[in-house]
Every structure is written in C-alpha cells, then in structure tokens.
Amino acid sequence: MPKKILFTGGGTVGHVTLNLILIPKFIKDGWEVHYIGDKNGIEHTEIEKSGLDVTFHAIATGKLRRYFSWQNLADVFKVALGLLQSLFIVAKLRPQALFSKGGFVSVPPVVAAKLLGKPVFIHESDRSMGLANKIAYKFATTVYTTFEQEDQLSKVKHLGAVTKVFKDANQIPESTQLEAVKEYFSRDLKTLLFIGGSAGAHVFNQFISDHPELKQRYNIINITGDPHLNELSSHLYRVDYVTDLYQPLMAMADLVVTRGGSNTLFELLAMAKLHLIVPLGKEASRGDQLENATYFEKRGYAKQLQEPDLTLHNFDQAMADLFEHQADYEATMLATKEIQSPDFFYDLLRADISSAIKEK
C-alpha cells in the first residue's frame, strides 16, 4: 500500500506555490498525494493547471476575521462544515501526514488531522504568522518558518526561504517572444520590471499610466493582471499574465519594483536582483508586507517606499539611490544564508515525517 500525504493551503498563489514544488517530489518517490481546498479557490485552479497526479477534495470554507462582522456568523457554520468534511476525508484516507501552507482553508484540515492523530507540518512564509497559522500552530507537530520569528515558539524550525530560483536564473534564456520585446527597448536605458501580484498590481499600473515620462527614462515591463492594458510599444511592455516568460523577464530586468510578498522577495534575494519594495499597507493586508519590507531593508537587501509616498519624485530618488549603491546591495544579497533548495526542505520534511510516525 503506498504512503499517503495530504496537502492543504490556499486563498492566494503564495499559499500554493511551495505545495506545487513539493508535490512532484512525493509523487516521484511513490507517495499518493491528496489536496484539501476550496473548489472555487486558486488552489484548485493551480492544481488542475499543474497536471499533477493529485486527488483534490473540496470542503466548505469561511474567512477568519480579527474584527466583528455579521458575516462571521455565517462563516462559523462554513468552518464547522469544513471541519466535519475534513474529519471524514482524513479518516477515510488515513494519510501518514498533512502539510499545510496556510490560508483560511487550511485550518479545518489541520484540526481534523490532529484530532485523528496524524502529524501536522506547517510552513509560514511571513515575518509574523497570519491568523490562520496562529490557530493552526496549536495543532501542529512542526512549523517551518522563512523568517526568524520574534516569539520563541517551541514547535518552530527556522528554515529560510525555499525557492527554485538561484543566481544562475539571471542568465537570460533564448525566447522568440523576449526577442520581440527587446526590439522595442533601448540598450541605453535601464530596464525596470513592475510586479504587483494579484492584490497589488493596480497601483503600479496607474503609476505607469499617470507618468508616461517614465518611458523616456527607463525600459518598462509591467505585469498588470489586466488584459485590457496589454501593450508593446517603444520602451514599454505591458502584459496581464506570464508563465514561461516570467523568469526570462525577471532576468532581463536591471531592477524589479515589487510588493512585499515573501515569495517574490526571496526569489529576488536568491537571484541577487536589485529591487525596490512598495509594500501593501494595513488597509489592504494584515501588515505582513510592511514587516517583510522592513526586514529586507534592515538586512541591506533592498530599499522600500511606502505606497502613499509613491510619487514620481520619490521614485526617481529611490532609483538613483539603488543604482548608485547597486554593488553594495548585490554583495549583501550574494552573502545571504537565508535560501534553501527544494531538495533540502523535502529531505528535512521526509525525515521529520518519519520521526513523527515512529514516535506515535
């Protein structure tokens, strides 16, 4: 009988990415892989798109809020239903372990696995735990963290960032699509790549639209999330979404302007890519991006600019400062010890699963 592992996590791409890195490794080693999530969530979309041999189990989901809302009442019942569904799934499958990447959908499966005596392993990407992982921590066997946590928690293992991206990713691969973009760009100008993510692209899109003079100073690549903005013209490439072209565009850029999501930040760190962080504020998130950005700035990896301060004058000043001190930023990033390979983490996780099973 093959070993079985349950994955969960969703709500944003960041809550799925690491799972999609680990799943093929388990499949290759003969594990039967199952995933618990929201059938309308991005986790289901990404699993379907991956083509991996994974059985998806849909459960009811409700959002966990730190503030009062009448919707909390309805969501309590959704979470309760999700827990019952998760208990049934875990009891039926009898997996060796559950791995959670967080997000609201992950709490019921984590609780269910713990109640049924299954080891629970969680990964936290941000400087501080989100509400879902704070709850899940109580039921976890081990929590792996990208950042060193300020609170000394007994179940936490500081891992560093797990990414497939490394310094050699700066080598630009051959691409006919990329060659077409280069024809519109000037070799005499620095190339900037704007990455806003699913929640933060709009501000960058508007900033570029409001300041056409940017095209006179830089080559601009703008991943917009909006197909209506697609454009390839002199010194400007706007595209709604990229997959295979993402890494070539990243390598092509002299500097990346990004939000403060940890996955992207650590990809940039792994590549030693010069970057400016414009984090989402507390009005658009729980403040995790502000913490991530401050951490990166204090470590000397990057410079940050708060969204309310994103004016053309401040932006140009930030660009000048970053390019003036480019060698210092790159040297600091190259010296980092905060990056781990997927193989390293997979081996660690497998060893911890084996230890947890033996201790039962």
UniProtKB/Swiss-Prot annotation:
Instruction: From the UniProt record, give the pathway where this protein acts.
Output: Cell wall biogenesis; peptidoglycan biosynthesis
Keywords from the UniProt entry? Cell cycle, Cell division, Cell membrane, Cell shape, Cell wall biogenesis/degradation, Glycosyltransferase, Membrane, Peptidoglycan synthesis, Transferase
Give the molecular function GO annotations.
Answer: undecaprenyldiphospho-muramoylpentapeptide beta-N-acetylglucosaminyltransferase activity
Q: What is its EC number?
A: 2.4.1.227
Any single biological process term in GO = cell wall organization
Q: Which SUPFAM superfamilies match?
A: UDP-Glycosyltransferase/glycogen phosphorylase
Is the Flavoprotein keyword given for this protein?
A: no
Q: Does the keyword Acetylation apply?
A: no
Q: What is its main location?
A: membrane
Location within or outside the cell: Cell membrane
* Residues annotated for UDP-N-acetyl-alpha-D-glucosamine binding in this entry: 198, 289
Q: Which reaction does it catalyse?
A: Mur2Ac(oyl-L-Ala-gamma-D-Glu-L-Lys-D-Ala-D-Ala)-di-trans,octa-cis-undecaprenyl diphosphate + UDP-N-acetyl-alpha-D-glucosamine = beta-D-GlcNAc-(1->4)-Mur2Ac(oyl-L-Ala-gamma-D-Glu-L-Lys-D-Ala-D-Ala)-di-trans,octa-cis-undecaprenyl diphosphate + UDP + H(+)
Question: GO CC terms on record?
Answer: plasma membrane
Q: Which Pfam families match?
A: Glyco_tran_28_C (PF04101), Glyco_transf_28 (PF03033)
The membrane-topology field of this record reads: Peripheral membrane protein
Family per UniProt? Belongs to the glycosyltransferase 28 family. MurG subfamily.
Q: Which HAMAP family match?
A: MurG
Functional note = Cell wall formation. Catalyzes the transfer of a GlcNAc subunit on undecaprenyl-pyrophosphoryl-MurNAc-pentapeptide (lipid intermediate I) to form undecaprenyl-pyrophosphoryl-MurNAc-(pentapeptide)GlcNAc (lipid intermediate II).
Q: Could you tell me what this protein is called?
A: UDP-N-acetylglucosamine--N-acetylmuramyl-(pentapeptide) pyrophosphoryl-undecaprenol N-acetylglucosamine transferase
- Taxonomic source organism: Streptococcus pyogenes serotype M5 (strain Manfredo)
